[in-house]
Amino acid sequence: MRRQSRVKVKARGVTIGGADPLVCLPLLAATVDELPGRAAELVALGPDILEWRVDAMEGIDVGQVVALLRRLRQVIGELPLLFTCRMAAEGGRCSRASGERLALILAALDSGEIVLVDVELCSGPQSRSPVTAKARAAACPLILSHHDFHATPPADGILATFCAAEAAGADIAKVAVMPRSSGDVLSLLTACDRARQGAVGIPLIAISMGSLGVVSRVAGPLFGSDITFAAGAEASAPGQLPIGELRLAMATILGA
């Protein structure tokens, strides 16, 4: 039986940090017209959470974001929707100024259509504070995330990042790193396990990316990771498995 987080997070009918790990699919669409169809395709695959990576859509403004969120809700029904506008420095496609990106995130929170929001831990208190306040007011759980597409810190460093995210007000802490050896994958899983043993109380997302790190996406829940990301029509990060393959492998490892 996998170790659960002390703090459980509720998001439109799902429990994050409970007995069952959840699978999230990224929604990537380059144009407004593509978005509803792509969303419908992903919903049919049966994810637990859908992540709209709005940074994949260039030129979208605040008004369009709100309108598209309402349109998405009509397509996805009650499926929990995570809103992410990933900055380029952490593997995203957003080249906007920080103020423009912040405006999109705040508008999404104001819309009432999202149930989770992701912001990078490195964005700093000045950028995070308005999002944190708005998320609290909207009762929308906040994911504070850290991505390193070049290397994997030692387990102590990864654990420190989980702790920093919790201290900064995260409801969920996410760390995704790139391994250069099998030992790096073990460092990620070790840090997750130590966090779950008591160092961190909130739910965790722990990912080792690329082909070396695939095992973390499948077996991560055994070490305390609460959400894993799969590929639908398109992967949003290296190493994501198709959702059907991921669920089958997880069922085998977790004994479901």
Predicted regions and their residues:
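Catalytic alpha/beta core domains of metabolic enzymes, predominantly
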Residues: 106, 116, 121-256
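Active-site beta->alpha loop and helix N-cap motifs at the rims of alpha/beta catalytic domains
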Residues: 2-6, 18-137, 141-143, 147-151
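Short N-terminal or domain-adjacent regulatory/targeting segments
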Residues: 1-10, 242-245
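Short boundary motifs at domain starts and secondary-structure transition points
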Residues: 12-18
